[in-house]
Amino acid sequence: CLICVHFFFLETLPIERRLNLNIKQVLNLYGAIFKQKSFRWPMLAGCFSGGILFCYISSSASILMDDYGLNQQQFAYAFGLNALGIMLLSSINKKLGRTFSVLQRLKIGAVLQLLGVMVLLSASLLSNVALWIVLIGMFLAISGIGFTGPNAMALAMAEQGERAGTASAVMGSMQFACGLLAGVMLNFLLWSALANMAIVMLIFVGIMLLSIWKLSQLRTLERQ
């Protein structure tokens, strides 16, 4: 990939606008972007929202196939249904653009994910919970990303201007870091697969909600 980028992806920016950056300058730029509250809070909200998806990917096969006995085809249908949910809510998010602000739609997605995680956590604490309840919890927790993902990205990039590329790189890196964190946390928890997933999801939802609250406070101060 690096070889192809170096030899075949030509720079289109005019020479007079190009920057000669070294590693120290790049790291300083990353730090400056991360310190900017208008970027940091929506970035954290979006990354930990996406981290819920990584929790699901890591645990869903064990829950649905090992615990509930779904075969490979049935699991594929369940997995595809949640992917369809993300697409469906992304479409609804677009249609609500004229009615609700970006921040309001981000909050809608956060509420959906919180509801889904609470359903999963409740199911993990009870015995012999029906499969359809777990599937509903998964659907809400995952499909809510159709709201949180694009709106968190839009809010994070809104004030970046010429730094949009670097800011996007920071956000992308943090999303995968959250995915790595989710995998590590799941490996260290010793309860059932459903309980482990629900607990990590709950932590991630909590950080996401805190970030959205901080962002709302910041927006309120800016309007005053």
Predicted regions located by residue number:
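C-terminal transmembrane helical hairpin of 12-TM major facilitator-type secondary transporters
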Residues: 104-151
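Small-residue hotspots at the loop-to-helix junctions and early N-terminal turns
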Residues: 72-80, 169
